[in-house]
């Protein structure tokens, strides 16, 4: 597995079965520019219309996904103070090549005990150091 920082909040997790691009900024790239046909884009929040695509698998919320051999879990956590907002941040856990990689996204406050339990044990944790909730 290879993990690369692509700038700002964007990371690439490349495994033997596919690629996960986390929080890609701007419009999705032209499919001919993407090297791996099994590329999945995941977003910790769904507040941008540029995330819609007919060419790529795009995940924008919690759930369990199996895409081309990639196992991806999205766990809901608060994007803001839960007392004032119901917006969610999705923590994604990619399970590939025998490793679990978790991307915290942009949490707005501490996750619940249930969310922490769903995230569980991970091998690599990617944290946005500019997140307001850290």
Where are these regions (language model features)?
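Histidine-centered catalytic micro-motifs
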Residues: 44
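Core dinuclear metal-dependent hydrolase active-site scaffold
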Residues: 1-39, 47-124, 131-133
């Amino acid at each position: 597995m290879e993990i690369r920082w692509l700038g700002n909040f964007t990371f690439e997790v490349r495994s033997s079965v596919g690629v996960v691009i986390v929080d890609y900024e701007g419009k999705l790239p032209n499919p001919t520019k993407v090297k791996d046909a099994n590329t999945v884009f995941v977003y910790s929040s769904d507040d941008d219309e540029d995330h819609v695509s007919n060419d790529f698998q795009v995940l924008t919320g919690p759930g369990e996904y199996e895409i081309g051999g990639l196992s991806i879990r999205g766990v809901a956590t608060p994007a803001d103070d839960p007392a004032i907002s119901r917006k969610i941040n999705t923590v994604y856990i990619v399970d590939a090549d025998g490793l679990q990689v978790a991307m915290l996204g942009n949490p707005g406050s501490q996750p619940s005990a249930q969310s922490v339990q769903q995230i569980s044990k991970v091998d690599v944790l990617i944290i946005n150091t500019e997140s307001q909730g850290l």
